[in-house]
Amino acid sequence: MLKFVILLSAVACALGGTIPEGLLPQLDGRIVGGTATTISSFPWQISLQRSGSHSCGGSIYTDRVIVTAAHCLQSVSTSSLQIRAGSSYWNSGGVTVKVSSFKNHEGYSARTMVNDIAVIRLSSSLSFSSTIKSISLASSNPPNGAAASVSGWGTQSSGSNSIPSQLQYVNVNIVSQSRCASSTYGYGSDIRDTMICAAASGKDACQGDSGGPLVSGGVLVGVVSWGQGCAYSNYPGVYASVADLRAWVVRNA
């Protein structure tokens, strides 16, 4: 899912992250193999913006707290950040709210991408509606093969510079942590305890979808984190596992 190839290392460096073993986090992009959708189908989705431009995705946890990826918030000032909620378009509609503070997981590592989760506190509360809703955190990981969806405004191909204005989504299937780390796929020991994977042929999240929601069974099960390319065969998208990091989110929200 959110994946850069090595040629995009300059982008990651510009955004303040280091790259784990040639596998890059996605910082600006589109859903690969996806379909345009509306925010009413994914009302917990927000666009995290730096200086008014889409940077990453995120999920509404409470009316004042957003869950996103820690790698989205490296070397960035709070004053440059805002979120847009309640719109199918990252650049218009809905509401924009300034960020008052954020906290990255203390155990986050840009080298290994372990604990890639963060919470954002908003300067004012969101008003919930049909297009702005919170989503519950998973308390356990879904089984291997479970149906899931991922949404965002990320690039639609690996290495692309352009992003769509309208929200995109793809349906994927969960790949359990143990299976994702097995010889079936190409990651091996790069898959850690706080990660979960998802895949579908020709479909994935990509640059710019980072921090966005992986949803299964109506709850947030993953946060778009990293991967090898976008929709590359043998390399599922890798997500921060919300069930494994739930206690940290609740404690810091």
UniProtKB/Swiss-Prot annotation:
CDD domains in UniProt: Tryp_SPc
PROSITE patterns hit by this protein: TRYPSIN_DOM, TRYPSIN_HIS, TRYPSIN_SER
Catalytic function, reaction form: Preferential cleavage: Arg-|-Xaa, Lys-|-Xaa
Record-annotated Peptidase S1 domain positions: 31-253
GO process annotations (BP): proteolysis
Database matches in InterPro entries: Peptidase_S1 (IPR050430), Peptidase_S1_PA (IPR009003), Peptidase_S1_PA_chymotrypsin (IPR043504), Peptidase_S1A (IPR001314), Trypsin_dom (IPR001254), TRYPSIN_HIS (IPR018114), TRYPSIN_SER (IPR033116)
Site (Required for specificity): D204
Residues excised as propeptide: 23-30
Catalytic residues in the record: H71, D116, S210
Keyword Transcription belongs to the record: no
Key words of the record: Disulfide bond, Hydrolase, Protease, Secreted, Serine protease, Signal, Zymogen
Signal peptide span: 1-22
Annotated disulfide bonds: C56-C72, C180-C197, C206-C230
Primary subcellular site in the record, as a coarse category: secreted
Any single Pfam family the record assigns to this protein: Trypsin
MF-aspect GO terms: serine-type endopeptidase activity
Localization of this protein: Secreted, Extracellular space
GO CC field: extracellular region
Protein EC: 3.4.21.4
Family: Belongs to the peptidase S1 family.
Record-given protein name: Trypsin delta
Species the sequence originates in: Drosophila erecta (Fruit fly)
Gene expressing this chain: deltaTry
